[in-house]
From Swiss-Prot:
Similarity section: Belongs to the phosphoglycerate mutase family. GpmB subfamily.
Listed EC numbers: 5.4.2.-
Matches recorded under NCBIfam families: PRK03482.1 (NF002901)
A single GO cellular-component term on record: cytoplasm
PROSITE patterns referenced in this protein's UniProt entry, alphabetically: PG_MUTASE (PS00175)
InterPro entries: His_Pase_superF_clade-1 (IPR013078), His_PPase_superfam (IPR029033), PG/BPGM_mutase_AS (IPR001345), PGM_Phosphatase (IPR050275), Phosphoglycerate_mutase_GpmB (IPR023086)
Organism classification: Bacteria, Pseudomonadati, Pseudomonadota, Gammaproteobacteria, Enterobacterales
Positions of the catalytic residues: 9 (tele-phosphohistidine intermediate), 82 (proton donor/acceptor)
Pfam family, one: His_Phos_1
Identification of the protein by name: Probable phosphoglycerate mutase GpmB
Alphabetized UniProt keyword annotations: Glycolysis, Isomerase
Taxonomy, superkingdom: Bacteria
HAMAP family referenced in this protein's UniProt entry, alphabetically: PGAM_GpmB (MF_01040)
Length: 215
């Protein structure tokens, strides 16, 4: 059975400011660095063999802290990037017009073809993150990879494993530096293939960040 751990990056400056990041970037805050150190301490006990991270700066920062704790190198994979949020990137959530808020909601409220202008659909996101996950099956036997990615990207991945469409209404909250686990297995009791063992665990964090869109 292959176990794959999933970690969202630590809190960033734009998370704290409630700005839309997408594939734009901002650095980790001091709190985000502390979250990364705390999830790294947990990861150190899990027998992690590979760290695979989105190539955006905030995930690289988080991955470096985890990799140092686990004694692993980092493999960068752009397929693990966050959803491209198009023309809304860098905008403050509270500054959106009604029309712009409508664009954002089509992504997370179950609209199949929803996308922000110049951005990416949830289905396109799903295809690339699923491909990145599938490549974990090519790792040597006995591997235990940890993927460092983003809130919407990881939420989409876990939700589709549970059988929801990529564009389903968002019902899974993955806070900064939460940890999830998915397993690939053959089982007489569960569906064969990927199953969700744990999602969004923050028990290792002393002060988890709020979801920036829920404040």
């Amino acid at each position: 059975m292959l176990q794959v751990y999933l970690v969202r990056h630590g809190e960033t400056q734009w998370n704290a400011e409630r700005r839309i990041q997408g594939q734009s970037d901002s650095p980790l805050t001091a709190k985000g660095e502390q979250q990364a150190r705390q999830v790294a301490e947990r990861a150190r006990t899990l027998g992690i063999t590979h760290i695979i991270a989105s190539d955006l700066g905030r995930t690289q920062q988080t991955a470096r802290i985890i990799a140092d704790a686990c004694g692993c190198d980092i493999i960068l994979d752009p397929r693990l990037r966050e959803l491209d949020m198009g023309v809304l990137e860098k905008r403050h959530v509270d500054s959106l017009t009604d029309e712009e808020e409508g664009w954002r909601r089509t992504l997370v409220n179950g609209t199949e073809d929803g996308r922000i202008p110049d951005g990416e659909s949830m289905q396109e996101l799903s295809v690339r993150v699923q491909a990145a996950l599938a490549d974990c099956l090519k790792l040597p036997e006995g591997s235990r990879p940890l993927l460092v990615s983003h809130g919407i990207a990881l939420g989409c991945l876990v939700s589709t494993i549970l059988g929801l469409p990529a564009y389903a209404e968002r019902r899974l909250r993955l806070r900064n530096c939460s940890i999830s686990r998915i397993d690939y297995q053959e089982s007489p009791w569960l569906a064969s293939g990927w199953v969700v063992e744990m999602a969004g665990d923050i028990s290792h964090l002393d002060a988890p960040a709020l979801d920036e869109l829920q404040r």
